[in-house]
Amino acid sequence: MTVFEKHASLIMLLEKYGFSLVGENLNGERVYLKDRRNLDFSDPCKAFPFLSDRVDHAGCIAIDMGYHDTMFASSELAKTLQERVDRSVANGLKKVYIGSPYSLAFQVGDPVFIYRKFTGTQGRPGYKSCITSYCLVTRIERIKTRGRELMSYEQYRRIIGNKSVFTDQELLEKYIISDDLTLIELLYYGFFGAGNNVNWVWLKNNDCWPGTHPLNFRYSREQFDRILQEGNVNVENVIVD
């Protein structure tokens, strides 16, 4: 990738996502390169969009379809009219999930699938609820537990920034009303695309639906690879040595 020195903000973004300066063109453009043979997996942004071959498990996050379609706008479905709200979270690579889980089967650095939960009334939910995307967990913060505040509202709001699907008022209400509140920051690694999403029926029939709450799913490496393949993803182009 080439960029002129005056484009400082773009250069900062390239360097944040693992591109290195390797030279200059005759016209003064800087040449930046990202080498998949030399990735820094200690920093998810620098390794993006690749995952380390050391991955041995993955988690899952279920999101109601209305929120999903705004938060993951690129994760399209075939033959489905998806309603979206125009918010900045749709365009960013970083997303924030906010919920009240009792427990989580994943931690920072783990990949997770995004499961679009069908909440409509038309059609069969088993075919309309599906995994559409995969992310990497970059941060987990307990905001409140058993009614006790572990973080001020200002701190909580600052971490979220523009990465949530919720409005300011909704975020405030969650902070006030919820006894337990957890923030999960995600880096949006990829999506399957219309016609490739992996529905609940396939997951159940292929031993990929453990039967507990999705936040407690712990997929093995073999299951993780199998779901990616079913989503028409070339695993060798995602998981590298």
Language-model region placement:
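Residue-level detector of short, conserved catalytic/binding motifs and their immediate flanks
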Residues: 110, 133, 184
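Contiguous surface segments at macromolecular interaction interfaces
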Residues: 1-2, 6-77, 88, 129, ...
